[in-house]
Amino acid sequence: PRPVGVEIPVNIWNTKVDKIPQDLVGHPKSGPILNTDQIEEAATLLNKSHKPIIIVGGGAQNFSVEVNQLSKSLSAPVIAFRNGHGIIDGSSQLSVTLPAGRELWGECDVVLAIGTRCQTAQMQWGIDDHMKIIHIDIDDEEIGRINTPEIGINAYLKDALPSLLDNMSGKEKYRNDWVKKV
């Protein structure tokens, strides 16, 4: 699940083949299997948090509904990096810009990183000792690449986010002081 560039010479574009050699047929590796224990652990940590933040990247583009539900149930601001813009409506009270997110970053206690490398936040904004990071990504090489998260979940978001929402259902907590800060 990384970006891939394939270069095909122009003289090959219109070449006809009768049969594709079997040794050229790719065999995709099977995807990660959702670890429900990690999801439960993440739900518990998020429910106990006082100042959660959600960070989204391009990997979360098709999961706007789930991200918005998580944001509302946690009263958590959402910071969108690069390809994560548009996942949450920019006019939402819980949508924050990068400069505002930078200010909130130092105060948050739990970060839920969804489909993002979380590179800018971790490398430029820093990590405080009290901050716990939950990182959900399909690419296991991205999880812990910069900093070891409290919980690293290697999973398809189509499996992880509904499961996380189910585990958090009925435990929504409005964080009035945190929302006012946003």
Segments and roles (model prediction):
Residues 10-34, 175-178:
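Aromatic-enriched
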Residues 5-7, 19-21, 44, 49, ...:
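Phosphate/pyrophosphate-binding active-site segments
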Residues 27-33, 90-101, 145-159:
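Short beta-strand elements at the ligand-binding edges of bilobed clamshell
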